[in-house]
């Protein structure tokens, strides 16, 4: 519901690690195509963004088997009176909330059937809330507040695959016996996540280094469209 509470195809861009400690992650690498982004003409900048935005579709296609497995597994749970939860922080969490909010008007589904949980709650939907994603225990508390149980499904969304809030939620779901699905935009060997189904959308480095609201966000929205629509047409 809209109410919010507290393996794929890679990029061919050359990778240059930035200086921070997350530089090993694919999403945090420097995209050589944008090293002089501020010096491009407007036409060249627009063309570069359009060219780079072809990569999300390639990434989603590369993850098609995991997406198919997730659709079937979620549909089976929902047919047995389970629910679907999206959980994330920042852009990843907002995209989950968006997809959940659009299910009732699109599919006439009850608002409790698909729910989005964003680290930091409603304020984080409108304003970045750094630090709120760093507590694994916060995810557990948010899931417990929704009555999350072993019949349910959790899709933990984290572009870089390292968000403690998402990791904590996935661990809780998996240990509870619920269906646990991870969605990230880095290879599993860079950031393994506890889950039964692992969806990796390898969009590569962003034109703005580390700004995963760009290609990673686009691929995530595409993947969530597939999950929710694929599931709903099977109910």
Predicted segments, located by residue:
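Cofactor-/ligand-binding subdomain signature composed of acidic, glycine-rich
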Residues: 2-59
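Short secondary-structure boundary/capping elements
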Residues: 37-41, 66, 131-138
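A ubiquitous structural signal for well-ordered alpha-helices
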Residues: 45, 70-73, 142, 169
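Short, basic, glycine/proline-bearing loop/turn elements
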Residues: 52-62, 128, 153-156
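A short, well-structured juxtamembrane/interface segment
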Residues: 62-77
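Residues at the C-terminal ends
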Residues: 79-80, 175
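Glycine-rich phosphate-binding loops that contact phosphosugars or nucleotide phosphates
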Residues: 85-235
């Amino acid at each position: 519901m809209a109410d919010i509470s507290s393996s794929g195809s890679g990029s061919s861009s050359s990778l240059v690690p930035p200086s921070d400690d997350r530089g090993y992650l694919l999403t945090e690498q420097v995209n050589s195509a944008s090293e002089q982004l501020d010096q491009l003409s407007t036409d060249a900048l627009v063309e570069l963004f359009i060219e780079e935005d072809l990569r999300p579709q390639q990434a989603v296609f590369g993850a098609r088997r995991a997406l198919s497995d997730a659709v079937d597994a979620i549909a089976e749970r929902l047919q047995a009176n389970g629910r679907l939860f999206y959980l994330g922080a920042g852009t990843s969490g907002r995209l989950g909330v968006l997809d959940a909010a659009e299910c009732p008007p699109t599919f006439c589904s009850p608002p409790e059937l698909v729910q989005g949980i964003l680290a930091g709650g409603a304020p984080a939907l409108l304003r970045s809330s750094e630090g709120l994603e760093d507590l694994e225990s916060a995810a557990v508390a948010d899931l417990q507040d929704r009555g999350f149980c072993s019949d349910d499904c959790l899709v933990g969304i984290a572009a870089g695959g390292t968000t403690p809030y998402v990791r904590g939620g996935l661990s809780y779901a998996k240990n509870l016996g619920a269906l646990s699905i991870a969605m990230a935009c880095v290879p599993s060997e860079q950031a393994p996540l506890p889950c039964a189904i692992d969806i990796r959308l390898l969009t590569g480095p962003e034109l703005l280094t580390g700004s995963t609201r760009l290609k990673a966000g686009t691929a995530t929205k595409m993947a969530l469209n597939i999950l929710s629509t694929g599931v709903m047409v099977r109910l």
